[in-house]
Every structure is written in structure tokens, then in C-alpha cells.
Amino acid sequence: MPRYKLTIEYDGTPFAGWQIQAELPTVQGVLAAAVKGFSGEEAHVAGAGRTDAGVHATGQVAHIHLARDWRPDQVRDAMTAHLRPHPVAVVAVERVADDFDARFSAVKRHYLYRIVNRRPDLALDRDRAWRVPQKLDASAMHVAAQRLLGKHDFTTFRAAECQAASPEKTLDQLDVMRSGDDIRIVTSARSFLHHQVRSMVGSLIRVGEGRWSADDLADALAARDRRRCGPMAPACGLYLAAVSYPEQIVETGAPDRI
């Protein structure tokens, strides 16, 4: 059975998240329906990341098995036709080895969080960025963010319902960049805890407002106490931007799209 790797982008606003849920619209659900629509097969669409309700993606990766040997461009175009009118697009399809797994073969996941730092409401970026009206010091946020890099117990930034076996994660990147009113927070790690990125962003906002120092953020991390976390940032600003795989597998959703 041929195995295909799909690179997917989507607007998460109308969905109850990635994972199939009974009687709720999900990204995985509409992708599975699209596969069945053109192939007649009940294929499992296995994703690299289980994004929450309202979270977007520019570089989600999934894999599927199909009984028939289709050309990758045929799979892409057929899924495009069957995904309409949902705000989901399969932007690339590749044939991959049978042991490729979108989730377990991944060596790094890259997330982007978008903030628009202005008082006026958002007309074009509504539901696609977090509008923060109070002035933020992005430079202070970036300096503080570096205190979270490396291997730590991230219990402070972990959702109560997180099912991960351990709260320890290794954070490889957490950069805060400003251009005009736009603030972009880019973070990378092999994997993240449930709500970890949004929790870190919410805490960095306190630094940007001048309410916390870099030491305060480091102390919150060291406390390993969810009650020490800042307010969790909303889902609308978060994007799964890219997923990286070992060198023998082409990197998908290249970070230059972030």
C-alpha cells in the first residue's frame, strides 16, 4: 500500500481542532472525507500535531495509506477538489517510505504566534492574530524568552488536562520579533506540552507590559506551578508553521514560511 506525506495549511477558526470528534467539524475529519471522496477508501489521516480549536497551520504534516498507486499530484488535486469549501488546503504531496510516520518521525516542530499590538480592532486579521492594545516592549520579551531555552520541567506552562508522560521538554528556540505593530513569536522543539506555547506567550505579555521582569519569568518556570503562569494567549494567534524530519526525509513547511 503506497504511503503519502501531505503538507497542509488551514484556517482553524471553524474547527473544533485537528482530531476527529463526534458531530463536530475537525480538520482531520474533513481531510478523511476528502480522501474517501476521491478514492473510496476509509483512510486514517495521521497528523504530526494535534492543534486545538481555533489554531491554524501553514505547515501541518500528515500521512495516509492508499490501496491504489496514485501519482502525488493526482492526490493533491483530487483532495483540493473534495476539500472545498472548507478553509483547508493540501499544498504538497510526496510518496514516502512505509516506515515514515508524520508524528513519530518528526524531529522538530515549529510554531508561530502572531500579535498585533495596536488599539484599533482588526479588520483583515480577525481570528488570525491576537490584538493586544497596550504597548508591548518586544525587546524585553525576547530577552526574557531566552530564560526558557533548554531542558526544563515546564509544569508552569502545562495545561491541567495535558496527557504527556513527563513535563520535561527541551525548548530549542523562542524568539520575539517586532515589525511595526506586528509582533511574531517563533518557537521550536521536538515536541510541546498541551497549551505550552500559548501559556509561554501569555506570560511573555506580562514582561512586555512591564509587569514582570526576566527574573520573574524564570522564577515562574522554576516554581513548576500552573498558578504562576500568566494568562493563556488565545488560540487565534497560533500557527503550526513547520515540521522537520531527519535529513533523509525532505523538510516540510520550511521555516522561511514563518
UniProtKB/Swiss-Prot annotation:
It holds the Pfam family PseudoU_synth_1. It is an enzyme of class 5 (isomerase). This is tRNA pseudouridine synthase A. Substrate binds at residue 111. Disulfide bonds: none annotated. Its EC number is 5.4.99.12. InterPro entries: PsdUridine_synth_cat_dom_sf, PsdUridine_synth_TruA, PsdUridine_synth_TruA_a/b_dom, PsdUridine_synth_TruA_C, TruA/RsuA/RluB/E/F_N. Belongs to the tRNA pseudouridine synthase TruA family. The gene is truA. Formation of pseudouridine at positions 38, 39 and 40 in the anticodon stem and loop of transfer RNAs.
